[in-house]
Amino acid sequence: MCPEEALELSEKIQKTVCSTHEWGSAGNINIYKSTGNEVSTKILVHDAELHSDKVIYYPTPEPKDNVMDVDLVIVPGVVFDEKMARYGRGGGYYDRFLDQLPKRTCIIAIAYDYQVLSHRWKLKLNEFDIKMDMIITEKRIIQKRGTLNYKE
């Protein structure tokens, strides 16, 4: 994918995140700083900075005590399946972090649609892997209760 297309798709994904109830109702948001080929998070950070009721936290290797106050987590990943499973970069950082969160915390993965395996494929998870509540791509929102496809 060329850089221009990646930027366009990243913007679409982020605008979709900003339009969700989960984003609108979240006060404390943990969000990754995008690098390389990951979906950009610049629009999300900017949107949160415009709203005084939102506080942004960035992931750290040793999460602070405020982890219990997080309403929403935006996570990256390498590949996902439609059953809400996620493979990251293999270090287990996010799974350890997500496991500490209260059950009420919403976990949203943002990804390009090509990163999501079709329903015929399923990622093999281990006991430590944490499933997402929602996966948002440029084409659809995948939720535990079903998929919303965008009209092209």
Residue positions per predicted region:
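Charged helix-capping and loop-helix junction motifs
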Residues: H46, R89-D95
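Short, solvent-exposed loop/turn segments at secondary-structure junctions
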Residues: G36-N37, V79-F80, Q115
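Surface-exposed, charge/polar-rich loops and edge strands
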Residues: K64, M68-L72, E82-K83, R96-E152
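Internal, well-ordered alpha-helical segments in soluble enzyme and binding-protein domains
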Residues: L9, I13, Y93-Y94, K131
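Flexible loop residues that form catalytic
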Residues: S34, V78, R140
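Redox-cofactor binding/interface segments in oxidoreductases and associated redox assembly factors
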Residues: I31, V75-P76, T137
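N-terminal active-site beta-alpha-beta segment that forms phosphate/nucleotide-binding
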Residues: M1-D69
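Short, basic, glycine/proline-bearing loop/turn elements
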Residues: I29-N30, V78-K83
